[in-house]
A protein has these predicted regions:
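Glycine-rich, N-terminal phosphate-binding loop of Rossmann-like dinucleotide-binding domains
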Residues: 82
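Short acidic/polar active-site loop segments enriched in Thr and Asp
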Residues: 76
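Active-site histidine-acidic residue metal-binding/catalytic motifs
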Residues: 1-68, 73
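A short, glycine/acidic-enriched catalytic loop
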Residues: 13-29, 85-102
Length: 102
């Protein structure tokens, strides 16, 4: 069985990880956006032979600890979802992919 570790990057209270007030008056937290995507992925894959391992719990867990949790769960793939800054004045942006393992 294929095991997919899902992580809704960052915790709910991680400082600064929210939408710019100029485009979202509610300043939606990045965790909320990431969690919705992880929930949808888990829902879509729910009826398959893919086992979902959730690494997120709303707390700000260090990235090394998240990776260790995925490894402990013997995940075949670890997917960490993020919404990077960069819209209308933000400095960040982009998509990253990192590979590793054997």
């Amino acid at each position: 069985m294929f095991k997919l570790a899902l992580n809704a990057g960052h915790g709910y209270e991680t400082a600064g990880k929210r939408c710019l007030k100029s485009i979202d008056p509610k300043e939606t937290r990045e965790y909320e956006l990431n969690r919705r995507i992880c929930d949808k992925i888990a829902e879509i894959l729910g009826g398959t032979d893919i086992k979902i391992i959730r690494i997120d719990n709303g707390k700000d867990i260090p990235i090394r600890s998240r990776a260790a949790m995925a490894n402990t769960g013997d995940a075949d793939l670890y997917l960490s979802i993020h919404h990077n800054a960069g819209i209308r004045g933000g400095a960040g942006g982009g998509i990253e992919a990192a590979g590793g393992g054997n």
